[in-house]
UniProtKB/Swiss-Prot annotation:
InterPro entries: Herpes_1. HAMAP family: HSV_TRX1. Its main location: virion. Belongs to the herpesviridae TRX1 protein family. This is Triplex capsid protein 1. It comes from Gallid herpesvirus 2 (strain Chicken/Md5/ATCC VR-987). The keyword Cytoplasm does not apply. Keywords: Capsid protein, Host nucleus, Virion.
Amino acid sequence: MKPLLRSHETQYYSLYPDTLNGLHNVFRTIGNSVQSDTVRRLNLGYLDGDNRRGNLAGGLELLRDATTPNASRMNITRPLDTSTSGATAMIMQSLRTDVAENITLLTGDSRATISRQVTLTDFCFPDAEMPGLIILSIRHPLDINSEALYATPAGRDPRVMETVWYELSELAAVSVNRVNGSGVRPSLVSLSFLIAARASDYADKCGAEALRAHVISNYGRRRMEEKLDRFGICLITMLRCRVFPHRHFQLLGGLISWISQREIASITAVVRGPQESIKTEQTAMPRSSVYVPACAYIDFDKDIRVIHEERSSSSLYLVFVYTQKFGRETVRIYVMRSRLGEWAFREGLGYMYSGVRSNNAITGVDGLIVPHGANVNMEFPLTKTLDLRNRDRRLGIAARSRDLNKADWKVDLRGRPTKESCMYAAYCRLGHLDESSVPVKKFERCGSLDIPVIWIPGVIWNIGTWIECY
């Protein structure tokens, strides 16, 4: 929330420039009293010394008279204190109570941004879910097929991508050609559907299979199990063709309300701000909290044993984990809670999935075309280059002429490890939690099934960009 506070602070001071100038004068007056003594301390008040005492009094009077919309509410009402700690407390209290209050009026703690989108309900059926479910948007399959044409490495067929999407289109309203590419399409996918499509890849088999059974029985579609299988095959084929799913799935937000009719729905989600700030229009659940299937939730800091505080401010991350062993690819999606920042979280992922990371570096090139033969330049011709330089130096050939005799090294990178073949995870920031938010595991009744879920109260949506891990 600090970047958000800074942005609104800048907005506030742009509206009231006199306040900023006044505060600058206060700190400039205080800064003039800094003495270059042995302890280098800040002398804010003195019992003696009219000049220094006058500077402090003038600074406090200027702070008291700062022109703000709520200047009359500033908490400098008692006589000026002559002690250093008293003057410091007065300044800090004034800055916190007045400036922070005006910034809060501009931001609004309960203000949030929502998005409404119309979609077909093939991959997201809101009637079977509860408010608070994480919703993702998916790009058009034609974009995925187009990227596969140039992203697929040598030795793998990019046309398989078009084939698996065509097979999925037999069960879902997925456009696979330019003729019927217009109109409403299944542009949203729920986190439950995404996890159920690859339920066999999760360590928590019971929770994943219970979620899959919930999607099959409650989504109200024919041949739902086969649709999940084919969607899961599409994810694996995307990974095999190096069209990574996270590049085509974007976070939309948390489900709030919806209007559905037959196979189409208008879905509203919170994309920025507190999840609980928007009403759900349901009497049974007027406010909603974000929830995640238990099989896909990880308390990151607890698992890697780096921070042991249960109550502290933290962030939520959406993480895609890839295993790229040819013929045994896996795609797992997790929601992880961590107190670490975005870049420190990346190092933690490398520690947690060190096995997956090393296996991808070794087996990520299986099934690719590797050049063979005597003409393959596997190593840099260092010896030949040194021999040419020594010979030219003995013969007295000029440096410009020696450039023509440099060794020509043309390496063939087909079948060599690249950052795409070594990619083991990708994540993006989902939002923030304060220290009072503690996730709770519960069993929720969905139709005739009990599904283990993790309720995460107090989520403040602040979606970031994708960061890839190699």
